[in-house]
């Protein structure tokens, strides 16, 4: 069963779901939140998480640069053509995975920046595995 991290905006005494992230996302692992409860999260913390995601994006970019240099070395190696093509295909698959990671991390960072902008004027709350919180579910962390 997949677990989720939920973000809510408080409107009067109601909590409106504004985003959710499954356990398989980087956002899920980067945010500190209570289980089956919610806590207030501020603009600064949201922007800090967004910056950590951007750092992951920068790491992926540096890995792509490294792999591109490796591709140049593979093409000039003395291996058979078939071996070279196998190695090149393998490296290109890894590059494609990093490119997907970059797009995903960028999207998550933009989403968190948007939520951080909301936090300037609204109370934003976060929690694991709590889809319909009430006032009594608020904890201080």
Predicted regions and their residues:
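Acidic (Asp/Glu-rich) sequence patches and key acidic residues
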Residues: 1-141
């Amino acid at each position: 069963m997949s677990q989720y991290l939920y973000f809510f905006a408080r409107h009067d005494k109601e909590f409106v779901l504004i985003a959710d992230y499954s356990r398989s996302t980087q956002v899920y692992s980067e945010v500190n939140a209570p289980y089956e409860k919610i806590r207030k999260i501020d603009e600064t913390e949201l922007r800090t998480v967004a910056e950590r995601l951007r750092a992951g994006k920068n790491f992926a970019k540096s890995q792509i640069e490294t792999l591109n240099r490796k591709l140049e070395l593979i093409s000039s190696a003395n291996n058979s053509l078939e071996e070279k093509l196998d190695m090149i295909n393998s490296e290109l698959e890894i590059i494609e995975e990093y490119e997907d990671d970059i797009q995903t991390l960028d999207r998550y960072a933009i989403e968190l920046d948007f939520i951080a902008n909301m936090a300037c004027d609204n109370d934003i709350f976060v929690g694991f595995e709590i889809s319909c919180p009430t006032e009594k579910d608020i904890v201080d962390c």
